Amino acid sequence: MVNHGNMYGPSFTFLGIPQCDLDIPASFAGADVVIVGAPIDSGTSHRSGAKFGPQAIRGGDYLPHDGSRPHLALRTDGLKDLKVVDAGDLMMPGGDLVASLAVLREATEKISRSGAIPVILGGDHSIASADVAGIANHLGRGKVSMIHFDAHADTGEDQFGALVGHGTPMRRLIEDGYVRGDRFLQLGLRGYWPDHVTLAWMRDQGMRSYEMTEIHHRGLTAVLDESFATLTDGCDGVFLSVDIDVVDPGMAPGTGTPEPGGMTSRELLEAVRRICLELPVVGIDVVEVAPPFDSADITAILANRVVLEALSAIAKRRNGSTYSPTQNILDR
């Protein structure tokens, strides 16, 4: 029998961390973070392939999959300093998007109620309507604020006549009362959608959307400073949703709806680090990685690093130690 090992086996976990089974609560009892894959792209409007995203993200690394990743800047190990387990991919029937999202909603609620932070690997962005809802079912509707990185607002009233799709989840979350519109922030929007009617709806909900031109001229640091004050007002936790197409397609080509003029990979990683260091994050999803359109796995590697950045920063926040981005790393 051939032993492929943790890195190349037919079923491998995120960088070799322990497995768990959501049907066996004891297998993730006491976990700080549970990673779960949502391999579905039935909600896409253009290029499919995001259903292959979860495993691409899990394997997006050139180092041994040994369940350890010391962070050079933060001096923490997000996979060791936290108890992180991987539940594998959910069974999500591609022909029934509504049923698949119900499976995800139940799974994220179960993880949240266990006391762990769900980290969901997508999959297309339709999954946000389910994973955020699952956490809100536990913590309370309107008690979870949201920070959403994306080239697109995803606030469509419908998607080619369908209420569920990767262009509508943020509208569904607000209309269904899971997230308050005035505690919903978006960063990285650009391009040629949505239309003025949808923008008016977003304004009426109290949403705050930072288009890339504003971010460029004001600076990402100033935008994040302004965002953080809003996110923690009247809410018990923050959900971080990262659509990889927020990054310029020159740095993240492997996605379904690429839009030029986006963030750099460094900007995204620094933003994720700050969010997870400074805010009470209760859930994360990383979506729209479409390996068939990737080049040399650079999009999958970036998505992998988004997850690692978040876990490392959460570990740093929990251990209470200080961090200065301008300090010499040898003196930390």
PLM region spans:
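Conserved alpha-helical scaffold segments that buttress catalytic/binding sites
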Residues: 2-332
